[in-house]
Amino acid sequence: MPKMKTHRGAAKRVKRTGSGKLKRSRAFTSHLFANKSTKQKRKLRKASLVSKSDMKRVKQLLAYKK
């Protein structure tokens, strides 16, 4: 079986924290801000963790990323 490769798109979007969790940025932050409340925009600035249900799949995409 061939070697697994790191998914480059996922590698650019996700960082691993010190404890091994995966940190990601939030969606809905590129445009159309006039329709979003100030509170919503403020909450979108904060990074978030990859959910437990997606963790296995995302870790597989980032097989060799430190």
Curated annotation (Swiss-Prot):
SUPFAM superfamilies linked to this entry: L35p-like
PROSITE patterns assigned to the protein according to its UniProt record, in alphabetical order: RIBOSOMAL_L35
Pfam family, one: Ribosomal_L35p
UniProt biased composition (Basic residues): 1-26
GO biological process: translation
Chain segments carrying region Disordered: 1-49
Keyword terms of this UniProt record: Ribonucleoprotein, Ribosomal protein
InterPro entries membership: Ribosomal_bL35 (IPR001706), Ribosomal_bL35-like (IPR021137), Ribosomal_bL35_CS (IPR018265), Ribosomal_bL35_sf (IPR037229)
Name of the molecule in the record: Large ribosomal subunit protein bL35
Gene: rpmI
